[in-house]
Amino acid sequence: MNIIYLHGFKSNSNSIKGKLLQHYCAKYPEIQVHLPDLNMSPNAAIAYVSGLIESMHDVALLGSSLGGFYATHLVAQHAVPAVLINPAMRPWQLFRELFDEQLPYQVHPKWCLDEADLVQLQQLALPVAQDADKILVLLQQGDEVLDYREAHLSLIHI
């Protein structure tokens, strides 16, 4: 089993959640955890993870925040199972609200969020999550940035 952890916005492949997942799964030699760095444009991130999925067998995704948004697209594209942790459902709107005056916004030394990224995010959005039977959604109140109710309403059919 290969688990690909998709980190959230302003995070990276060394995130605490990813490292905890890797540490926990180390007890199970049949599970390999992959922690790709997704600090790149949305289209590049999707292409990169798609390449990983296509190069492996028995793949599942675990996506947090922006990584959860990416996972919904990747499930539809590759029919792999996914767990979404407080997924961002309309990140282009959220980022515009948070950073509109500051675009381009330096997210990471390797990536500046700009208007083209917001357009890419909107184009990646699905009106309804596809392959809903392959998705488990975990929501928690109290997230400092994301309102769990938005994900709940967007994914209520799952």
Question: Where are the regions a protein language model picked out?
Answer:
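Active-site catalytic motif of lipid deacylating hydrolases and related acyltransferases
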Residues: 1-56
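Active-site nucleophile loop of the alpha/beta-hydrolase fold
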Residues: 38, 84-92
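Gly/Ala-rich beta-loop-alpha elbow adjacent to hydrolase catalytic centers
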Residues: 62-67, 71
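Active-site nucleophile elbow and catalytic-triad environment of alpha/beta-hydrolase enzymes
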Residues: 109-128
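Short beta-strand/loop motif that positions the catalytic acidic residue
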Residues: 137-139
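Conserved alpha/beta-hydrolase "acid-adjacent" motif
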Residues: 144-150
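Conserved small/polar residues in nucleotide/adenosyl-binding loops
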Residues: 156-158
